[in-house]
């Protein structure tokens, strides 16, 4: 069986022309049958995609040929099945949303620590270790003795810092996240707030799991990932968690045995939080998902609106590509 290559990538770089990159990038991904989502902003590129090895290699070559997008930080893992349903390239204000203006990792950032040096750093009693990820990610796995800020989104992280960290008291701060991108901004933010010794795990948790042997590892549990695998274990293979299609929270097989769990409708995490109207909508969505699956029109997890959206985006990408080729021909004639 041919393995699907999953590629997580990002790069902070000044991209004043980022809007013009979207159409050719989307067209390239669709032609190579790459699925997943990439975000473009004036500060760079970020996302996770999947495809055949040849397709992912072609994407990296294409990106490397674009002005400013060479030498992109990327990490590869493998899966037996395609972990994404659609192909998207989105234009954003930030490639990772902290919501604080003026934070620029290109100007100031924390000290990068290689995975093989990470254990020694976080074993230092003078170092406070902070997990910059969201609470639902931390719950299924984190580093030994790491502090959980209990945030629901990355936007809440600056407030956590203001309320809980002090440059005069916390002399050494080490931080980590899934692939490294959130720490680019979190360490830049701490440096701007006057913290002196600020460190972050280069390549994030995924790089650590790839390079550090399990018997030497200080990682505990699994690592949440933003695709249909939900989580990966220390071997970077799909873990034991599933995901509630209603609230998107990771759930265990034990939780799926709960009366609160209804496929696509509710789980123990959200049963008391969703309204009757939401429940009706989720039931209908699940019905449409099953109908689409029976017609072989979409994978599980897609509803009719998403199928329509995917079709429209593909047609729009084809239209833009055709228009660009036509304009190029006219320019040659002139």
UniProtKB/Swiss-Prot annotation:
SMART domains registered for this protein in UniProt: RHOD (SM00450)
Under the heading CDD domains, the entry gives:
RHOD_YceA
Which GO molecular function terms does the record list?
A: oxidoreductase activity, acting on paired donors, with incorporation or reduction of molecular oxygen
UniProt cross-references to Pfam families, sorted A to Z: Rhodanese, UPF0176_N
The family classification in the record reads: Belongs to the TrhO family.
Q: Which HAMAP family does this entry report, sorted A to Z?
A: TrhO (MF_00469)
The entry's active site is 177 (cysteine persulfide intermediate)
Alphabetical list of InterPro entries matching this protein = Rhodanese-like_dom (IPR001763), Rhodanese-like_dom_sf (IPR036873), TrhO (IPR020936), TRHO_N (IPR040503)
SUPFAM superfamilies (UniProt xref) = Rhodanese/Cell cycle control phosphatase
Residues forming the Rhodanese domain are 123-217
Q: Which reaction does it catalyse?
A: uridine(34) in tRNA + AH2 + O2 = 5-hydroxyuridine(34) in tRNA + A + H2O
State which Enzyme Commission number(s) the record gives: 1.14.-.-
Recorded superkingdom: Bacteria
Arranged from A to Z, the UniProt key words for this protein are:
Oxidoreductase, tRNA processing
- Kindly list the biological process annotations in GO that this record carries: tRNA modification
> PANTHER family under this entry?
RHODANESE-LIKE DOMAIN-CONTAINING PROTEIN 7-RELATED, THIOSULFATE SULFURTRANSFERASE/RHODANESE-LIKE DOMAIN-CONTAINING PROTEIN 2
> What organism does the UniProt record list as the source?
Shewanella baltica (strain OS155 / ATCC BAA-1091)
Name of the protein in its database record: tRNA uridine(34) hydroxylase
